[in-house]
From Swiss-Prot:
It catalyses: 5-amino-5-(4-hydroxybenzyl)-6-(D-ribitylimino)-5,6-dihydrouracil + S-adenosyl-L-methionine = 7,8-didemethyl-8-hydroxy-5-deazariboflavin + 5'-deoxyadenosine + L-methionine + NH4(+) + H(+). Residues 1-235 form the Radical SAM core domain. It comes from Methanosarcina acetivorans (strain ATCC 35395 / DSM 2834 / JCM 12185 / C2A). The gene is cofG. Consists of two subunits, CofG and CofH. Its EC number is 4.3.1.32. This is 7,8-didemethyl-8-hydroxy-5-deazariboflavin synthase. [4Fe-4S] cluster binds at C9, C13, C16. Belongs to the radical SAM superfamily. CofG family.
């Protein structure tokens, strides 16, 4: 499940249609009851993971703290900790992506998350990120580094087609590789294609071609260590041709919630996706990859839930296809 807790954000990315400021139409901070309702429906639908996303450091935006006060919290971190606890109690494993974070914030969240993530996007200084204090590459790399020091299973990724060069992509992949070789915590790297959004500064910017995406996937598979998966989003690009180039993971597919970052792109049905892939088998995993399940890279707080949901290989006990069929019974 994809739960966008708030879309209020200090960054002003040139391609983002998700961000709002307090007082703007569509600006929101989800109330606890809203989140709890989605979590309960998720359990009934057979979900195992909730992705909590946030605009980055919304507290820096005037008016946001009043919204927090209205739901009884003094900080976004305190609210997020409550939501993670609630998800675990409901039977869902949290995965948090809230932008750049300090070591102390990561330490607080580690026991309550199966994994966490932050898109590097690019090591290049880009026009798309000119008004984005959280998109300074060194700051993002530092967050990823601190997660490694804390042994948090981690997701990162590149955003393809936002003004970076092929050499920038290689440099970005090498930066992620360097951190993984030092700490061993990168589960997967997402190779995500830019998709223009109406009303944004980059609404007329060209999308990357399929050939560009193929090349980016090939680069990722060549540069990244073999134990790091390469992922693409099947709601943004047809994955079949990319699997032959090195893609090994298709990310999360929600039966309940939309992709709030790319709301125009519907999730594929799991069974339709399997038909499209033909003899390429799908196997469902948890938000923590099998190798990290086997290593015990999780806290006591979520240990019993991971053990209940995982098989002896570290994957999910019941395949996704069976779950989809069960929902119709």
């Amino acid at each position: 499940m994809f739960i966008p807790v708030t879309n209020i954000c200090r960054n002003r990315c040139g391609y983002c249609g998700f961000r709002r400021e307090p007082g703007q139409p569509g600006a929101r901070l989800m109330k606890p009851a809203e989140v709890i309702s989605i979590l309960k429906n998720g359990v009934r639908a057979g979900c195992t993971e909730v992705l909590f996303t946030f605009g980055e450091y919304a507290e820096e935006m005037p008016g946001y703290n009043l919204m927090l006060d209205e739901i009884g919290y003094s900080s976004t971190l305190d609210y997020l900790l409550f939501l993670c606890e609630t998800a675990i109690e409901t039977g869902i494993l949290p995965h948090t992506n809230a932008g750049v974070m300090t070591r102390s914030e990561l330490e607080a969240l580690k026991p309550l998350n199966a994994s966490m993530g932050l898109m590097l996007e690019s090591t290049a200084s880009l026009e798309a990120h000119k008004d984005c204090p959280g998109k300074i590459p060194e700051r993002r790399l530092e967050t990823i580094r601190e997660a490694g020091k804390l042994q948090i299973p981690y997701t990162s990724g590149l955003l393809i087609g936002i003004g970076e060069s092929r050499e920038d992509r290689i440099e970005s992949l090498e930066a992620i590789t360097s951190l993984h070789r030092e700490y061993g915590h990168i589960q997967e790297v997402i190779i995500q294609n830019f998709a223009p959004k109406p009303g944004t500064p980059m609404e007329s910017f060209p999308e990357p071609t399929v050939e560009e995406m193929m090349d980016a996937v090939v680069l990722a598979r060549h540069v990244l260590p073999s134990d790091v998966s390469v992922q693409v989003a099947p709601n943004l690009i047809d994955p079949k041709a990319l699997i032959g180039k090195g893609v090994t993971d298709l990310g999360g597919i929600s039966p309940l919630t939309i992709d709030w970052i790319n709301p125009e792109a519907e999730w594929p049905d799991v069974r339709d996706l399997q038909k499209k892939l033909g003899d390429i088998p799908l196997r469902e995993r948890l938000p923590v990859y099998p190798q990290y399940v086997k290593r015990g890279w999780y806290s006591e707080r979520i240990g019993s839930l991971i053990e209940r949901l995982s098989d002896n290989e570290g994957y999910r006990k019941q395949p996704a296809i069976e779950n989809a069929e069960d929902l119709e019974k």
